[in-house]
Swiss-Prot record:
The family this protein is said to belong to: Belongs to the transketolase family. DXPS subfamily.
Residue sites binding Mg(2+) per the record: D146, N175
Gene name in the database record: dxs
Record's protein name: 1-deoxy-D-xylulose-5-phosphate synthase
Catalyzed reactions per annotation: D-glyceraldehyde 3-phosphate + pyruvate + H(+) = 1-deoxy-D-xylulose 5-phosphate + CO2
Organism (species): Clostridium perfringens (strain ATCC 13124 / DSM 756 / JCM 1290 / NCIMB 6125 / NCTC 8237 / Type A)
GO molecular function ontology, one term from the record: magnesium ion binding
UniProt binding sites for thiamine diphosphate: H74, G115, H116, S117, G147, A148, N175, Y285, E365
Native organism taxonomy: Bacteria, Bacillati, Bacillota, Clostridia, Eubacteriales
Amino acid sequence: MSEVLQRITDPKEIKDLDEKELEILAEDLREFLIESVSNTGGHFASNLGVIDLTVALFKNFDFSEDRIIWDVGHQSYAYKILTGRKDKFNTLRQYGGLCGFPKRTESEYDFFATGHSSTSLSSAAGMARAQRLLGKDNKVIAVIGDGALTGGMALEALNDIGYRKDNLIIILNDNQMSICKNVGGLATYLNKLRMGVGYNKLKSDIGSTLDTTSFGKRVKNSLSKLKDGIKKIVVPSMYFEDIGLKYFGIVDGHNIRELNEVLSIAKNIKGPVIIHTVTKKGKGYELAEKNPNKYHGVSPFDLGEGVISKFASRNYSSTFGEEMIKLAKNDDKVVAITAAMPDGTGLKEFREEFPDRFFDVGIAEQHAVTLAAGMAAEGLKPFFAVYSTFLQRAYDQVLHDVCIQKLPVTLCLDRAGLVGEDGETHQGIFDISFLSPMPNMTIVAPKCIDEMEVILKWASNFNAPLAIRYPRGGDIDVNLKPLSKIEYGKWEKVQEGDKIAIVATGKMVQHAMIAAQKIKEEKNIDILIINATFIKPIDKELLNSLSKDGFKIVTIEDNIKKGGFGEGVLEYLNEIGHKEKIVTLAFNDKFIEHGKPDILYKINGLDAEGIKNTLIELL
């Protein structure tokens, strides 16, 4: 590493660097990021792709005054390094360390927290309007990827920004990827724009030539009357300018000179500007350039060997994908939907085997849910695979388009519960609370991977709205047998016991088993453990029996306490006049920060030791 990055103590110092030094700084950042993220894990390829752009932004703007919002935020690592967080980068995504996304409480340079996609344009427009109303003239910049631009919220914002003529700069970071390959009409449009780069160069070259003589200037003035028509022919649609944005492109996102030129022009233009840059995910690390999807998010890895795929252990996502293929082979009405996450949700092989029955709608969860509702209305059996945290974006569609009509749409909620290192914006700890109040909604959870297969088979013949929630990763080493069949609304006694009954949901049954074993070893007392396969409806018959037999009851869930499973059980037990103690173990009313799940469970009293301590207090 050269001395350029080492000597930067204030981001304002970057303004004083010449072009050669800026290029060296970019290489220093690449070298530092490759070394650091290979040790900590994190978002890898996307960050390598925006380093040159980040350097150019610091050259042209003062972020002690100007504002920048990184859409999604996973590509903000170089920005974090240059804003005083380099020495803490070895704590990235660790509990108590740096967050992997922008976070207002982490730095004065993080102006708006992000994590979910397609929010940057709306927040940037809000900041720009606030600047105007407050009499300020600071620049506002939003950096958004071509994948995030497929999100409906981003398109809504573009429409409003073009109409209101907000004074902001939008940088379209076009790497032709979100996590996986982009899909949809906008992706096709952007590809046509890339192909039309010759038009932009031709226009520039001809203009420069004509400007050299007075006759040429008159010719240029006459030809300008044909400009709009020529654009329509050579560059398809000119969508951005049609809705009121000044378009600059296409710019090489790895050419600092080009970036400086266009940014220096854009910052002096009033009204909305969009700069279309083309970048390469993984730039500077050959293996990531060749396979950016594999290197999107990585665990720690050896730089010489690269990321090694893990095939040894089963996980819920891959099992879901395998079972979906089995269902589709036996039932031609089964279809799969995802919102730009075919790999993460385990549907990659399904897509290859059943391309006509697989629908990747892009980053469009609202559309995905109502698309599924339409399919269900016509007799298909749609399964929408989505991370729990992203289903939050489609609350109204689930309620209005699925539940009111009681349509048989199956919501497969991957990453339910703690996801760990991605932190507050990605923890899947709210789905029980926002789905439970919906009439006609049923919620189930497998206690182990093998039970996932049983539930999915049952779900394919369930004729009403259904949510299946399951965690990231695999099982703990606990010996659990799956249910042989599903009986609607009924729970399962996993282990017999006296005095205390644990009623746990999903993977928390495994935590309960370990805690109960500790109690057996220390106190020689057997704890009754119940697998609440159905989170909604609750098994009132079994609860009546527990109450009649005088059990103290502990509910355990990896969801927030408010509106959760435990509160539903507590409400019913109070209704029937249960006399014994009731304890609900869940996450309290707070957001759960980033860190390894084991640490986060422990801190929140939901690991086996914490559960054991709760049980001891009840004995």
